[in-house]
A protein has these predicted regions:
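N-terminal amphipathic, basic-rich helices that act as targeting or association modules
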Residues: 48-198, 346-353, 360-372, 376-379, ...
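Long, structured ligand/cofactor-binding scaffold of large enzymes
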Residues: 102-306, 317-320, 423-426, 445-541, ...
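Terminal amphipathic helices with adjacent charged low-complexity linkers/tails
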Residues: 132, 157-202, 345-453, 617-676, ...
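Mobile "lid/hinge" segments at catalytic clefts and subdomain interfaces of large enzymes
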Residues: 250-388, 498, 502-510, 542-550, ...
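Extracellular/luminal Protease-associated
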Residues: 339-346, 580, 802, 806-846
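Long, charge-dense accessory insertions within large macromolecular proteins
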Residues: 599, 652-798
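Acidic, glycine-rich flexible loop/linker segments
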Residues: 623-638, 850-922
Length: 940
């Protein structure tokens, strides 16, 4: 395996070298080399180390003139390992992984039999298994800290006497730079180039570091800035549905394409039957380095879709209803698989939108099995014809194909007739808050009264403008996010709404910041081919960049006069975006109410300029002659959209735009890096710093011990998201992070964002629990990252944590339900650990954040017996002790004592959410990366 790795790496470097040095000699050489395709070369030389195959399930599949090995689920059943015939396709992917890696150690024959027992028990058998995904996907906000960790691990293994080359990804890793572009300029033809220029100005340190990582690490590729969003690039290009590799014996093996990603919306690719989900960066790093992912065989909820979408509705409307239904059912930690006759009427683009929002409905994944539509999509998006043929043959041969006979066993089921879907939005704070479009105005007014407690109608003058600002006005309208820009039907729909509106002489309202940020360059190709980009430009939706932008909070500043009016009047300004998240404080610090909507509805709301309207029936504006215009006047028919998609979204467009996906523009090509094996950490960098995790590491581990006399850092409510814990957006010079940068002569204009500075632990520690909308229940009527320090005075959470660390006092945090919901960002756990928090006690945890806490050595606990922070009457001046941790077992209940300020003691029982045996090892090592590092050092 090592020899193959080295050969692949040498050839990769050789090709890059030829590209670089041959250019002055012969301009044709770089193009010839690019034609060799690095991915194909790495697939030739990379190996998958398969197991011993005790049950002899390996078979050969012939596709065309080529024979390829695979691990047969029917053969496993014939060998007497159990009945697997009615397992859901999503679970069969995991089963195949067990067959391929069965080695008698990490994967046993009993692990394989457990899948048959799952079916016999009606879809339940939570056995711990070791799962190995084929590859890893990253974006730059989470990818930079991951590469920082890998670079630090190289330093760490050198300190332990090991070889730095031991720290190398064993599986393919793709990092797509998509999270850094911000919308500084909008509504003009120059917006795209100006935003790109500012992106490079802000992020050159980070980009240099990532390019060093690409040269220093095996199997690590970077998709440069300005290319697209990682999940859309993954869906349209990187994913293969069926992957192939050579095994250690040199034989080619086919198996399901699988991955984990350092972004929670990695789930999107399950629309194309690729099993993938989000993990924290620390878990992804462990997977890269060969550590299997420890998981329980999940429950699988079947979601039956029937019927077809009605005229006037979109895939976005469907997914918002699905999110509402699944959140109400409760599917955290479960797989969801979609089935039913309705799939015959559901394009893969709509499936991908539904799969994308799995984190919003709480599931580990939302999976769509392989069928005729999958094959059509793979061909349409430019996949190699031989690969498309392999996908179909493999799926039919190995039991992954969905047809009219597909009838799996599910743990639970739901049903939705797609003919009942109506146009909708979701908001103002949660993706599951579904609102039918006809009820939008009433719902907003109700939120104003009950949630925001603000009156309607208060008007504030805007300096230098003829209009006024008032609550409900839309100040941001953004066509953004892979969730919807990957879907040609809604993007063409938005363009047609713009065309009809522009033809009538309409425009977006002047107070609306409009933007179009597609997830891939293919979108621009078909919008240009359809001649729709000029219509979008005409109503303000100019291209601002290829990246996540508004969806992750990179919406950029509002016009200062508008921002001032909102602040002066304490108004509830609104944003409408085609994204997947609308958590408070996420989109813009000036916006309190955020609504998710389809791209055509985003355009319509920009034209109307307010949420205080029944968009379905009210007048949204006037044409050039003063005549009233309604939504129905500018809404395209389903047939109009379908015909234009058919005419303009072509295989040739995908082949063209992805031909040079790793090349980058001239700015990227000009980034110069060294070829050192270890990173030369720049002392003055405010973007990349050597983290403290591995400094001073030894081979010694420590047993888990009881927690004694911990103080309370924060008491938080329900649905505390990772955005609350570790915000990604901008910050001011008055914050601890802002003060840190100011002290280092960084001007506020150059602060960039928290997300862009995740390679610097000093900034990120100061940004932990620093969301401007977080509410610590220890303080009355205070928003933001504050708590009570050791002396009882109010101070920033970072300052209090440092004061407690000086005293040697451990800290705990109390939370409510769904603690850690939202993004997969591992800094929500890293920051928690670096602040000195030893335990988080909540009513329930979201899957990824719980895992991340364990991965950083912080123990999650859940209340039992109906106890909550409220029922216990906690106010933050208590002292907490948790006993019974020595020799603790996974999911064990342990006693805890809470000593109140008056000296009285409340004894409660907590459930330890260390879920598996290997997680015990992680905690004893101080975290998963310490565990991996010590094991690699031992093997050196």
């Amino acid at each position: 395996t090592g020899q193959s790795l080295n050969r692949a790496r040498m050839l990769q470097k050789l090709l890059f070298g030829i590209q670089m040095y041959a250019k002055p000699l012969d301009p044709q050489v770089p193009q010839l080399i690019r034609g060799l395709n690095i991915l194909s070369i790495l697939e030739i030389f990379m190996t998958v180390v398969v197991g011993q195959d005790t049950a002899k399930t390996r078979r050969t599949l012939t596709v065309g003139s080529k024979s390829i090995a695979y691990y047969s689920i029917p053969a496993a059943q014939a060998a007497g390992l159990g009945d697997f015939s009615r397992l859901p396709a999503a679970l069969k992917v995991v089963l195949e992984n067990m067959l391929r890696f069965e080695d008698g150690k990490t994967v046993s024959v009993d692990d394989i039999k457990a899948f048959a027992e799952w079916g016999a028990k009606g879809g339940k058998n939570p056995r711990e298994i070791a799962y190995r995904p084929a590859r890893v996907l990253m974006q730059d906000f989470t990818g930079v800290p991951a590469v920082v960790d890998l670079a630090a691990m190289r330093d760490g293994i050198v300190a332990l006497g090991g070889d730095p080359e031991k720290i190398n990804p064993l599986n393919p890793v793709d990092l797509v730079i998509d999270h850094s572009v911000m919308i500084d300029e909008f509504g003009t033809p120059r917006a795209f180039q100006m935003n790109v220029d500012r992106e490079y100005e802000r992020n050159m340190e980070r980009y240099t570091f990532l390019k060093w990582g690409q040269s220093a690490f095996n199997n690590f590729r970077v998709v440069p800035p300005g290319t697209g969003i990682c999940h859309q690039v993954n869906l349209e290009y990187l994913s293969q549905t069926v992957w192939t590799d050579q095994d250690q014996n040199g034989q080619e093996v086919a198996y399901p394409d699988t991955l984990v990603g350092t972004d929670s919306h990695t789930t999107m690719v399950k629309g194309a039957a690729v099993l993938g989900w989000g993990v924290g960066g620390i878990e992804a790093e462990a997977a890269m380095l060969g550590q299997p992912i420890s998981m329980l065989i999940p429950e699988v909820v079947g979601f039956e879709l029937t019927g077809a979408m009605m005229e006037g509705t979109t895939g976005t409307d469907l997914v918002l209803k699905v999110v509402e239904m699944l959140r109400a059912r409760g599917v955290v930690g479960k797989f969801v698989e979609f089935y039913g006759t309705g799939l015959d009427n559901l394009p893969l683009a709509d499936r991908a939108t539904i799969a994308n929002m799995a984190p919003e409905y709480g599931a580990t994944c939302g999976f769509f099995p392989i069928d005729d539509e999958t094959i059509r999509y793979l061909h349409a998006t430019g996949r190699d014809e031989d690969r498309v043929a392999l996908v179909e043959a493999y799926a039919k041969e190995n039991g992954f194909w969905r047809d009219e006979t597909y009838a799996p066993i599910y743990t639970d089921t739901l049903h939705l007739d797609m003919g009942t879907i109506v146009p909708a939005i979701s908001g103002p704070k949660r993706p599951q808050d579904f609102v039918a479009l006809t009820e939008g105005q009433n719902a907003f007014r109700r939120e104003m009264e009950e949630t925001f407690k603000r009156p309607m109608g208060k008007q504030i003058a805007v300096a230098g403008e003829e209009y006024t600002m008032e609550s409900g006005k839309v100040v941001i309208a953004s066509i953004t996010s892979c969730t919807n820009t990957s879907n040609p039907y809604v993007m063409i729909g938005a363009g047609l709404v713009a065309r009809k509106a522009a033809a009538l002489g309409m425009d977006s309202k002047p107070w609306v910041k409009t933007s179009l940020a597609p997830g891939s360059q293919v979108v621009s190709a078909y919008l240009e081919a359809a001649d729709l980009q000029k219509d979008l430009d005409a109503v303000g939706f100019n291209l601002v960049g290829y990246g996540c932008t508004t969806c992750i909070g990179n919406s950029g500043p509002l016009q200062p006069e508008i921002s001032a009016a909102i602040s002066e009047g304490d108004l509830v300004a609104t944003a409408v975006l085609s994204g997947n998240r609308n958590f408070e404080g996420r989109i813009s610090p000036d916006v309190r109410a955020n609504y998710l909507a389809s791209p055509p509805l985003v355009v319509a709301y920009a034209l109307a300029g307010t949420l205080d309207i029944n968009l379905a029936t009210d007048v949204i504006g006037q044409d050039r002659d003063g005549n009233d215009v309604y939504l129905k006047d500018i809404w395209p028919t389903t047939q109009e959209v379908a015909e234009m998609v058919e005419a303009t979204v072509t295989r040739e467009a995908f082949l063209s735009k992805y031909a040079d996906v790793f090349k980058g523009d001239e700015k990227w090509q000009a980034v110069d890096v060294t070829n050192q094996k270890t990173y030369d950490w720049p002392a003055g960098s405010t973007y990349v710093q050597n983290p403290p995790y591995f400094q001073g590491i030894t081979m010694e581990t420590h047993k888990i011990t009881d927690l004694e006399d911990a103080k309370v850092m924060a008491i938080l409510g329900d649905m505390i998201t990772t955005d609350h814990i570790s915000p990604a957006g901008s910050f001011k010079d008055t914050t601890p992070a802002g003060k840190y940068l100011t002290e280092r002569q960084v001007s506020p204009r150059e602060f960039n964002s928290y997300g862009s500075r995740r390679g610097n632990h000093e900034v990120m520690m100061r940004g932990t629990f620093a969301n401007i909308r977080i509410k610590n229940e220890m303080l009355d009527g205070v928003e933001g990252g504050y708590t009570l320090g050791p002396d009882g005075s109010q101070m920033a959470i970072f300052d209090a944590a440092m004061a407690y660390q000086e005293q040697g006092t451990p800290l705990v945090i109390f939370g409510g339900e769904q603690y850690g919901a939202g993004s997969s960002r591992d800094w929500a756990a890293k920051g928690t650990a670096l602040l000195g928090v030893k335990a988080v006690i909540a009513e329930s945890f979201e899957r990824i954040h719980r895992s991340n806490l364990v991965g950083m050595g912080v123990i999650p606990f859940e209340f039992t017996g109906g106890d909550t922070r409220k029922s216990l009457g906690l106010n933050g001046d208590e002292t907490v002790s948790i006993r019974g941790l020595e020799g603790v077992k996974p999911l064990q209940e342990v006693p805890a004592e809470i000593t109140m300020s008056d000296g009285s003691v409340k004894s409660i029982t907590l459930k330890c959410r260390i879920d598996t045996e290997v997680e015990i090892d992680y905690i004893e090592n101080g975290g998963v990366l310490h565990y991996v590092l010590r094991n690699l050092a031992k093997a050196a």
